[in-house]
Every structure is written in structure tokens, then in C-alpha cells.
């Protein structure tokens, strides 16, 4: 019992940015999870919440990602780059990243002696799965869960495939 009081559990909000919700790469599925994400954020204190923020610059279209996905999105300083206004509830830390996964986030979780991490956000099949697997690699004893009801993928099919991939890598998928 006393151990459970000392456990450190964090929530990580992945790339919950305007461009992925109703902007250049937005989807109706992303818009549909907004209320659930806001509800989930409210169950954690500010010092228990982390976030990632996809961050690109003017040279995006010259990058490998930009050549494979030639849609300008999440350019730093633009409205599309901002975390959705209802999700701006305060975070212990926000990790800006210009790649799918944040090594800095994974190192932070390892170095902070975290016991459990819950991930929510966008896109299940790109940045959520990338960050879940990075955390699993950097901190293999941390219990990782992903709330499927607070995530969405590029397509419903790729969302499902990513959830199955994470399950096979010993990541607990809840509300599936």
C-alpha cells in the first residue's frame, strides 16, 4: 500500500496540435476525440502531465519526412503548431520534436524514475507508437499504457494496426 503512494505516474499528450485536429492534416476522427482527451487531462495534475509538440520549420519540404508527406504542417509559431486550446491545461514539460519520436522524452522518463506512463494523442500509427516504443527501449521496466479512446490514427485501419503492434511489444492498450 505505501509503495503505491510513492509511485510516479505520468501522462504524455502526443502532438495534440491544431494542424492534426482541424488543420492541414486534420481528420473527423481527431476532432471526435477532443472531449475524451480533455477529460483525461483533467485526471492528472499539472506536474504529472508532459506533452510533445511536432515542430517543423521553413525547410520542411526538403526533409525526408517532407518529401514523403509533402503537406506543410506544425510550422513553429503558426496557429497550426499550437496545442489545441482546450488542451492547454499546463504541463510539467513540453518536448518539441521534428521527428516522429522524442529521444529527449524517453531519456527524461528513464532519468526521472517514473513507474508508469500513459500515452494519448495523435497519430496512433506514427508518433504515438514511435514514442511508446522509444520509452519501452529507454526505460524497459516502466509500465506503459496507451488509451485507445484518446488516440486516433491517419486512418481507422492504421490506428488499429498500431494498437496491435504496441500490444505485441508489451504495451498495455486500454479502452480498446
Predicted regions and their residues:
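Active-site acidic carboxylates
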Residues: 2-94, 154, 160-167, 172-175
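Cofactor-binding loop segments of dinucleotide-utilizing enzymes, especially the Rossmann-like FAD-
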Residues: 14, 54, 122-124, 149
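Histidine-anchored nucleotide/phosphate-binding helix
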Residues: 39-41, 129-139
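A short helix->loop->beta-strand "cap" motif at the edges of active sites that frequently abuts
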Residues: 45-47, 139-143
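Short, conserved acidic/polar surface loops in the N-terminal third of protein domains
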Residues: 60-64, 105-107, 130
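Internal catalytic-core helix/loop-beta-alpha segment
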Residues: 77-126
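Conserved strand-to-helix beginnings and helix N-cap segments that scaffold or border functional pockets
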Residues: 106, 129-132, 156-160
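A short glycine-rich beta-strand->turn/loop micro-motif centered on a GG-aromatic cluster
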Residues: 118-122, 142-156, 176
Amino acid at each position: 500500500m505505501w509503495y503505491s503512494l510513492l509511485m510516479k505516474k505520468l501522462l504524455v499528450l502526443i502532438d495534440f496540435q491544431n494542424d492534426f485536429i482541424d488543420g492541414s492534416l486534420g481528420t473527423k476522427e481527431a476532432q471526435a476525440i477532443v472531449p475524451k482527451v480533455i477529460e483525461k487531462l483533467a485526471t492528472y495534475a499539472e506536474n504529472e502531465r508532459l506533452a510533445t509538440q511536432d515542430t517543423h520549420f521553413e525547410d520542411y519540404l526538403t526533409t525526408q519526412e517532407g518529401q514523403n508527406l509533402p503537406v506543410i504542417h506544425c510550422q513553429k509559431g503558426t496557429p497550426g503548431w499550437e496545442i489545441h486550446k482546450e488542451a492547454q491545461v499546463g504541463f510539467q514539460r513540453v518536448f518539441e520534436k521534428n521527428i516522429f519520436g522524442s529521444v529527449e522524452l524517453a531519456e527524461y522518463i528513464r532519468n526521472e524514475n517514473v513507474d508508469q506512463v500513459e500515452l494519448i494523442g495523435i497519430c496512433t500509427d506514427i508518433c504515438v507508437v514511435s514514442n511508446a516504443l522509444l520509452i519501452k527501449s529507454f526505460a524497459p521496466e516502466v509500465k506503459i499504457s496507451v488509451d485507445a479512446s484518446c488516440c486516433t490514427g491517419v486512418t481507422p485501419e492504421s490506428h488499429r494496426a498500431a494498437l496491435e503492434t504496441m500490444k505485441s511489444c508489451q504495451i498495455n492498450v486500454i479502452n480498446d
